A protein has these predicted regions:
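Polytopic transmembrane helical bundles with strong interfacial aromatic enrichment
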Residues: 1-320
Length: 320
C-alpha cells in the first residue's frame, strides 16, 4: 500500500483551489452578464429602431425572468420526480420557487401601478393587472399545496399561471386565442425542458451507478419537448414578426439572439444524447446545456418586454 507524499497532497490541494477559483470567477462573470442583459438588454435592442419607449424595461425583465425561472424549476421538479423513478431524490425547491414566483408576479403589479400612476385597486381592474394577480395567486396556491405535503396538487395552480401569462403576452386584436394557445404549449414545454434537465442532473449526483438511467429517461421526454418547442416557436414567429422588420425592430433582434442560444443548447443536447447512446457519461454536455438554457430564459424575458413589431412594419408600409 502506498501513501501520498506531502508534496503530492499539496499539489492536489492547489489544483482543487485553482479549479474552485476558476469556477467562482466563471459564475461571477456569468452573473454579471445576466444582470447586464436583464437591465440593459431591451434598451440596447431598441436602439436606432424608432420604436416607442417601454417604461422600466430592466425591472420588468428581471421580474419576468424570475417568473419563468420559478415555473421551470417547479414544473421540472414535478415532472422529474416521475421520470427519475425510485431511489434517492434531491431536496425539494418547490416551496421556495413558488413563493419566489408569487413575489415576482406581485412585483409586476406594483411596477404596473407605478408606471401607470394608479393605485393597486385600480391596477387590479386593468387587463394586465388582473392577469398578474391571477399569476400571483396561482403561485401562492402552488406554495400552499407544497406546504400541505400535496406537491402534485400544484399542477392546477401552475396551469393557471401559464394560462394567465399566455393571455398577458397576447393582447393583440388579431386572433389572440391562437397566440395564447401557442404560448401555453411553448411555455409548458420550455419549462419542462429547462427544469426537468436541472432536476435530472441534481438527481444523478445522488444515484451513483444509476445516474445514466436518469438522463436516459429524461432524454426520451426531451425529444418530444423539442418538437413542441420548434413547432410552436415557428408558428408564433410567423404570426408576430413581419419579415420586413426582422433586423430593424427590437423584437427581431432579441429573437435572433434567442435562436442563437437555442441552437447552442440544441447542439449540446445532441452531444449528450450521442454519449448516452454510446454508453458514455453525458453529464458534462448536459450541464453546459443547462447554462445555455438559462440564457434562453433570460433572453425570453427580454423578448416579452420589447414592443410589438407590427406597428413599425405598418408604419413603413404607409410611408412607402
Amino acid at each position: 500500500v502506498t501513501t501520498p507524499t506531502n508534496g503530492a497532497v499539496r499539489a492536489t490541494g492547489r489544483r482543487r483551489t485553482r479549479a474552485a477559483l476558476a469556477i467562482g470567477a466563471l459564475v461571477a462573470v456569468a452573473g454579471a452578464s445576466a444582470v447586464t442583459v436583464a437591465l440593459l438588454g431591451a434598451g440596447i435592442a431598441a436602439r436606432g429602431t424608432g420604436e416607442l419607449h417601454i417604461p422600466a424595461p430592466g425591472t420588468t425583465t428581471v421580474l419576468r425572468a424570475a417568473v419563468f425561472t420559478a415555473l421551470a424549476l417547479h414544473l421540472g421538479e414535478l415532472a422529474g420526480a416521475r421520470l427519475t423513478g425510485t431511489g434517492p431524490t434531491p431536496r425539494s425547491w418547490a416551496l421556495w420557487t413558488a413563493l419566489g414566483g408569487a413575489a415576482a408576479a406581485a412585483g409586476q403589479i406594483v411596477l404596473l401601478a407605478e408606471v401607470s400612476d394608479l393605485d393597486l385597486t385600480a391596477t387590479y381592474g386593468t387587463r394586465d393587472g388582473g392577469l398578474l394577480l391571477a399569476m400571483a395567486n396561482g403561485f401562492a396556491l402552488a406554495a400552499g399545496c407544497v406546504a400541505l405535503r400535496r406537491p402534485g396538487w400544484a399542477t392546477g395552480p401552475l396551469a393557471l399561471v401559464i394560462g394567465a401569462e399566455a393571455m398577458r403576452a397576447h393582447p393583440e386584436p388579431y386572433t389572440p386565442e391562437w397566440g395564447t394557445a401557442l404560448t401555453v404549449v411553448h411555455l409548458t414545454a420550455a419549462s419542462l425542458w429547462v427544469g426537468g434537465l436541472l432536476y435530472a442532473l441534481r438527481t444523478t449526483r445522488l444515484r451513483g451507478g444509476a445516474a445514466r438511467e436518469v438522463l436516459v429517461r429524461y432524454a426520451r421526454l426531451a425529444g418530444w419537448l423539442y418538437v413542441a418547442l420548434a413547432a410552436t416557436g415557428t408558428c408564433s414567429t410567423l404570426r408576430r414578426l413581419p419579415a420586413d422588420v426582422v433586423f430593424s425592430t427590437a423584437y427581431g433582434r432579441v429573437l435572433i439572439a434567442k435562436l442563437a442560444l437555442v441552437a447552442v443548447a440544441s447542439a449540446l443536447a445532441l452531444a449528450a444524447r450521442r454519449r448516452l447512446r454510446r454508453g458514455g457519461d453525458a453529464t458534462r454536455p448536459a450541464r453546459a446545456e443547462v447554462a445555455a438554457l438559462a440564457g434562453v430564459v433570460l433572453v425570453s424575458a427580454v423578448l416579452t418586454v420589447v414592443p410589438d413589431p407590427h406597428w413599425l412594419s405598418l408604419r413603413s408600409a404607409l410611408l412607402r
